[in-house]
Amino acid sequence: MYEKELEKLLMAAGANLIGFSELGENRSPEHPEYGYAVTIARKLSRAVIKTINGAPTMEYFQHYRATNARLDSIALDAVSFIENAGYLALPVAASQSTPDKKEEYRGIFPHKTGAVLSGLGFVGKNGLLITEFGSAVRFATVLTDMPLTAQKEIQPCLCGGCQICKNACPAGAITGEIYVPGADRSTIFDAKKCSEHMKTYKNIGRGAVCGICISVCPFNK
């Protein structure tokens, strides 16, 4: 009912991909009252990704942060639309983490969950969502009680026997396994190893990000 109007609004605001999903059993444990999600995606600059050559760069760090901020702004447009229609909407920031003693390096809702359910792409061996733009994409999510229906079918993983990202990862954080829906993230990616390795690059800035697994991904070519 609202999907086309909402997609038009968010694309005009700067999104490159929009997805809608009914979460079912995949609801956020912290916010189970929201059974639907709007996934907002914005692709990263190919020129910036090309600056990554075996190590993270200042160009990528700055672009990463700017893209996240843009996504958060677009998410607020979605919140306004949904709440003006009489529903509730909770924005989940593009770069979000709410660590506790049990679950480090996780947020209140995985962006990839909503993106996969909406049919925007599949989870690759690098732990990232592979979309029509490859894995060089950032996401924000809006959780809501507005009834929404996925516009595309769920996609299977197409990584096959490729091990490029695993071999390129300096932290050894990528297992090289195919992601199985419902499995824990740790089966394909060790977030702690990745985070610990990035401490080497504190000179770039607080919260520096790597991007090597994106830069070598064949789906970005």
Where does each model-flagged region fall?
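Catalytic cores of enzyme domains
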Residues: A66-K221
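Non-catalytic, usually N-terminal nucleic-acid engagement modules in DNA/RNA processing proteins
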Residues: M1-N68, S73
